[in-house]
Amino acid sequence: MEGGAYGAGKAGGAFDPYALVRQPHTILRVVSWLFSIVVFGSIVNEGYLNSASEGEEFCIYNRNPNACSYGVAVGVLAFLTCLLYLALDVYFPQISSVKDRKKAVLSDIGVSAFWAFLWFVGFCYLANQWQVSKPKDNPLNEGTDAARAAIAFSFFSIFTWAGQAVLAFQRYQIGADSALFSQDYMDPSQDSSMPYAPYVEPSTGPDPAGMGGTYQQPANTFDTEPQGYQSQGY
């Protein structure tokens, strides 16, 4: 691939970690990875309170176990997804096929947009359940900072994942333009739609015409050499 495609150089080059960490989409992946840790870590550690009267734990978000479960599930899965695509970022320059690079970038667009949607749903869900929580369920305000942190970083994650989708779409547009020649170019000699294929005979002797090509004697030139006499029988 001349000049590379889809945001990376030619395949087979040496791995450059410094160039990798400077990529905007790689930076956003690391930030999203950290945000996911904050979300599910906050809920797991301080999102469940002990009830003295009931003798069992309950979710800090309006006693709704689904709210805590959603936050933990989205956080853990986003954490794993970030690791997967960080590994893909490392391997991406080694992909030699333009079609495979295109598939990787398209999957990045779809997955990032999908996670931005999931974080939006999670933010709205947790914020709503936190708003309707009853003060009597938590009179000592235990874990309130962690609950707010999970909501805040769910909100921030919407933009980090949406940013990844936008950057992946830009890579797709740039890559499609740079890969256009390599995908659509056809050698004229192999194109069956052309009426004829050009042919140039290499020159092996002097050029009497001075035109830089070969010289051929016209077919109707008078031949002065005797060809012999054939007698006819009468």
Curated annotation (Swiss-Prot):
Residues 1-23, 93-103, 170-234 are cytoplasmic. The chain crosses the membrane at residues 24-44, 72-92, 104-124, 149-169. Residues 20-173 form the MARVEL domain. Keywords: Acetylation, Cytoplasmic vesicle, Membrane, Synapse, Transmembrane, Transmembrane helix. Its main location: membrane. The keyword Transmembrane applies. GO terms for cellular component: melanosome; neuromuscular junction; Schaffer collateral - CA1 synapse; synaptic vesicle membrane. PROSITE patterns: MARVEL. InterPro entries: Marvel (IPR008253), Synaptogyrin (IPR016579). Residues 192-234 are annotated as: Disordered. May play a role in regulated exocytosis. Modulates the localization of synaptophysin/SYP into synaptic-like microvesicles and may therefore play a role in synaptic-like microvesicle formation and/or maturation. Involved in the regulation of short-term and long-term synaptic plasticity. Belongs to the synaptogyrin family. PANTHER family: SYNAPTOGYRIN, SYNAPTOGYRIN-1. This is Synaptogyrin-1. The gene is SYNGR1.
